Amino acid sequence: MGAPGGLMELEPGGRALRQEDLIQIIADPAIAPVTGAGDCWRGLANLRGGLIGVADLGVLLDGRPTEGGVMVAISCGGDEFGLLCAGVRGARELPGPDALPDEPLAGDPDWLLPAPPGEPRVIDVELLLADERMRGAS
């Protein structure tokens, strides 16, 4: 879905995904809960006839579940999963090469990369998948 070199900004604002990581954006996704999954996992959703796990960005960021929202389907190293977020703000360009990123904010997870002031912080999908909360059943 995504073109290399661009970002897709998500709600809550200030976070974005690289467009090349995106497969599809699904409004009002049907997510089936899974007993025993970790707190950040909302359940399973259908993507092109197959099931993918869906994690909740709100829970990952501040512990609060996302109400309603959209699911962005993501591909990383051949694996696919969904990320539930409050919404999608839209596409935007990557910051220019001279734009210096700020320092990570206190409490930011490792997978939320620093960005220049006024730009969204990019979610590093590989680092997100390595987060211990994303490792499945508890």
Question: Residue ranges of each PLM-predicted region?
Answer:
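An acidic, low-aromatic, low-complexity terminal/linker signal
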Residues: 1-138
